[in-house]
Amino acid sequence: MYSEPVTAVHCFCFWGERIVLVDVTGRGISIPGGHILTGESLLNGLRRELAEEACITLDSPALLGAVECDHSANPAFGPSLGYPRLASQLLYAGTVNRILPFTAKYETSRRIFVPALKCPEQFNEWDAVMQAAFEGALAWMAG
């Protein structure tokens, strides 16, 4: 289903009719998520990233799909970046079960709750991959 290793996980987090977005330094407005730490399970990494970036917890997140990251043709890629040449990033959807007080302690400067259908307008770098994942997240939410 996806190439190993998985280096990052991200999630469309639903709170009622809204989606949680975060403003991440260097990335802009996006869904929360980030890199998996060495030895960390994918779901534990996702839970940690959501707690750090958005100060939320989720009920059972559902895997929507994977994005394969192939740096073979990237002239800027090198071992010093600390990433493998071929890896995957996973995209999830989930329902927020707890909202904690927001603290801009990690990479995020703010957390916002936007109507789900307005998510593409708010997002910093929306593309065909995010659109497909978003449609999958909406379908998952609709049951």
Show which residues each predicted segment covers:
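Acidic, metal-coordinating catalytic segment for phosphate/diphosphate chemistry
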Residues: 1-10
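Short, solvent-exposed loop/turn segments at secondary-structure junctions
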Residues: 3, 29-30, 70-73
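A structural signal for short, well-ordered beta-strand segments
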Residues: 11, 63, 92-94
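Conserved Nudix-box catalytic region and its N-terminal flanking loop in Nudix hydrolases
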Residues: 14-53
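A short coil-to-beta-strand element that immediately follows conserved catalytic motifs
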Residues: 57-67
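Active-site-adjacent beta-strand/loop module that shapes the phosphate/pyrophosphate-binding cleft
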Residues: 67-100
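NUDIX/MutT-family hydrolases
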Residues: 89-95, 102-133
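Charge-rich, low-complexity intrinsically disordered segments
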Residues: 131-143
